């Protein structure tokens, strides 16, 4: 099976690599989900990995398959998977739980581990390949109506987290009273839309995750 990979630490090393075919049996306890990749987002993170700024190959490999923004269709599920069925459209998450207290309570995005595993970024192969398998816990179902934009779910989650954290920081002031405008702007994340201006909004900063079909 073909995949797009880099040699971490070597600039401009992007190349085609061969991977063994994945199967639902690769995941223990009958919880595997085999996915056909339909789209992969390519953003600044992937560029920086190819520039050798960071990135780490999985154990036993000297290359790293890139691509952390995925969208695909389920081909097969393990015997103990009930929440997802073959034919479903799905997106896979990126980071995997580690050992910190935040990982243990389901907040791996807030991990304090110095080293963590992220598909297509650090210690785990990514999704820029023909097929992949992962545990059902890391697979998010997508309505068929969103199939054309489903690959944007991962970068959108970063925007959502930024807004959520801005609200959380403000709530700690105890007397925060966000004023809502009478006329709401139609564009997502408009400055001042709900009393919060996303970071970079005034600069029209697209941020580090710029997505395109691969």
Region spans (language model):
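NAD(P)H dinucleotide-binding glycine-rich loop of Rossmann-like/cofactor-binding domains
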Residues: 97-179
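Conserved SAM-binding loop of SAM-dependent methyltransferases across substrates and taxa
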Residues: 190-198
